[in-house]
Amino acid sequence: MDNSAITSQSNPTPLVCSVTPIIVGSPPSPANVIELSSPSTPPTPLTLLASFSKTPSRKTTSPDSNGENTICHGVRQVRRVPRNNPGREKKSITGPSKEHKQRTRSPKTTTRREIKIVEGDRLIVGHDKREKKGATTKRMKKRDGVADKKLYARVSKVKSSENLDLDAKIPSSKVCNNTLPLVGDDMDNESSELQLEQAIKRRHDWTPAREVTTPVVDVAELHSSPCGKAVTRMHGVGTLLSDYGFSGVVETSLGTKSESFRNAPTTKRPMELQKFSTVPAIPTPTESSTTEDIQGSSSKQQRVKAKKPQKGKLTTITSHATAKYCVADQTVDLDYIQNVAPKSPGRKNISNRPSGMKHSNSGRGKSSTLKNDNGPPVFRVVPPLEAFKSFEGQELLFGTSSQLERGHPEYRCDETQDIQNSPSNSAAVSELAVPYRISSEGKNLGSSLFRLSGSKNLWSASARDLTGAVFEVDEIDFQEPSMGLSVLATKSRCHPGNRGPPRRNLVDVDNVPDKKLDIDTTEGENGNHSSVADNIVDRENLNPKISANTSETNLECAPRNKPAFSRFTTSELAKKVAAYGFKPIKSRDNMISLLERCWETQSKTFMPESKPNQGTDDARKNGFRKENHSDVRVRPDSATLANRRSPKKRQAKALSKFQEPNNFLPIENSTTTASMLPIEHVISSHTILINDDQLSDSVGETVSFLPTLDHNGNGTTLQENMLEIKSPATPNARHSRQRSSSTSFSIEPPSLASQITKAIKSQPRIRAFNGLKQPTWYEKILMYDPIQLEDLAAWLNTDGFGRIGEDREVGPGVVREWCESKGVCCVWKKQVSGRSHCLPMVS
């Protein structure tokens, strides 16, 4: 390092001597010999060099010609001169080994001085000769009064061995002095070596890594040297500047640290980073067998086993559908490799075996081999036939809208009635409309309505008894080899009394579609009828009436007086209730009230022209006489059996003119006919629902049988038997029945619920407006759209009821009850006032 830049602020040494200052710029003079020390204590060369920068007095010397160097108060201060200053000069002081010479850009002649330390007793300061270098010497002209100077010094006595050992310990760069360091010269010299200008530009794009090395300071050296603090300070400044130097070599190793940092005392434990960029390949069966013991012990120490998920049964449709896409959550470790690799049947899993256990344990290896149940189920594509069969065992959940769309029986019955109108399709109609079969070859007759016995759907679930239990389908065998069967079906309408609203507690059963059945009998005209004498039931008188216009006989009877059901015994009441097709009722009062309501209903529907016969009172006194309440058999007449078969044209004519069979009519002996045809009456226990305590909106249905006689001029003949099944409480049937009847009856208006349903279904489709579809109310219900009660009530009162000929009006409250009964999603219209909704009364 330059001698002019080495200073120190330490205390003055005891070897201070008077030194004559040398002023740069003075005229050349011969070398001066200065005595620096006494022979007893010879100074060191470093002390001699430091003494040249001090003056014996505190006088301030005059500045030189260039105004560069000044000496104030015994301390030399250096001031940097700008580059454009022509008087700037660079000085170099040669040390004991090298001689540095620098050339300035100033055109003036520079002065050089040298300090030569000669081993001896003298320090010689002398002049240096100018060196000439080609073209450069021409530009550098010497000024007057400026000359090169050299300093020569000689040590008076040789250093002792102790001082040499002390100097050898101190490095040459660690020079201490009492003066402050010369920052200017240090920056100039280091700027050329460190390339600070390039480093500053490079710093904008790159920040050097933080210094990871810990400087280690020799404690013994600090105690032995009085300038330990200065040495540490100089090293700190030097390393701070040298960190920003670019050596030209880029270190690629990450996380490398010097050995000195490992030995230095630290408070943090270094962490070793492991590279996971490469995953070990799946070993082959031969390789894994040789290395599985080593890998099993090492992998168990380096990883943590993940908690296995608990197995759960697939209970939802979503879990079944997404099971084949589920992937087990496992870590990338040896377990995952072993699961993917093919396993031999007798091999044991490495992850489940402890590290100390050897593979030679074959006995336990077999017991630990289990089938893999943790994986997702294997998805198997089934054939189409098996897939269709799976739908039969699937539990289907239907909403009320689906019932309204597909489950209502009137749609099927309408299709059946259209097919029945054609005579050629009588065989096909027999299988479509009738859920049971009647024949004389021994076939069973099912007693279900609307396919109740065939399929367990919502209609069968709705057939319940008084206790709430589901009805069981009863199958009655009507096999009778000695005679044929003649079946005609009607339905009975039972109106309640004067209790409650007029249409609220109505049990209304409409007509059923016609079904033509063949009549086969093997009995002769004069057959013996004594075997079925006990099966003849005298119910009420049959009044046949022959109409000249339609050539059709209508059999109607109307009792004059109401029977006193309270005088009947309990068994007689039970028989009468069973004759109407109801389930047995335990309460006597409930049976009496039910029979009275049924009698009133029949009396309203009877024709006023019908007249009772003589056997009416006898039938009431005798009651019912039959062995089986579900069978009603009547003997056929010989004349009737002779004329039993009629032409097909007559059958087709009777079928087209057949409007609706009368309601359930009790049968008793008639004076107009010698005998009666055998009739079997099927009374199903689940075909009608009547509540004991109160009759609700539940619709009861029954199947009754009525013979239809045609007049040929010679006598009465049984034409055919019809079975018609139709939706209960259908307004169309009521209107057609009212129009077809010869006389006007007193028929109460239909219920508002049925009228609302009819009005909603009768609404035509609306055309799209500006490309937007306008769904009808029925379509909104099927799409589960919320129905605003006020809007639906307004539409019914203005447009809906007008299409079906209904004059009444409904309010939002009635519409709400209808929506809740049908399961339709309904909401109130938002009102600004916020007052609560009240259910309006309907008159």
UniProtKB/Swiss-Prot annotation:
InterPro entries reported in the protein's UniProt record: Slx4_ascomycetes, Structure-sp_endonuc_su_Slx4
Region ranges (Disordered): 26-111, 281-313, 339-377, 603-655, 729-748
Gene Ontology process terms (BP): DNA recombination; DNA repair; DNA replication
UniProt keyword annotations, A-Z: DNA damage, DNA recombination, DNA repair, Nucleus, Phosphoprotein
Molecular function as annotated in GO: 5'-flap endonuclease activity
Main location: nucleus
Entry PTM: Phosphorylated in response to DNA damage.
UniProt biased composition (Low complexity): 739-748
Biased segments, Basic residues type: 302-311
Role, per record: Regulatory subunit of the SLX1-SLX4 structure-specific endonuclease that resolves DNA secondary structures generated during DNA repair and recombination. Has endonuclease activity towards branched DNA substrates, introducing single-strand cuts in duplex DNA close to junctions with ss-DNA.
UniProt name for this protein: Structure-specific endonuclease subunit SLX4
Annotated source species: Ajellomyces capsulatus (strain G186AR / H82 / ATCC MYA-2454 / RMSCC 2432) (Darling's disease fungus)
Originating gene: SLX4
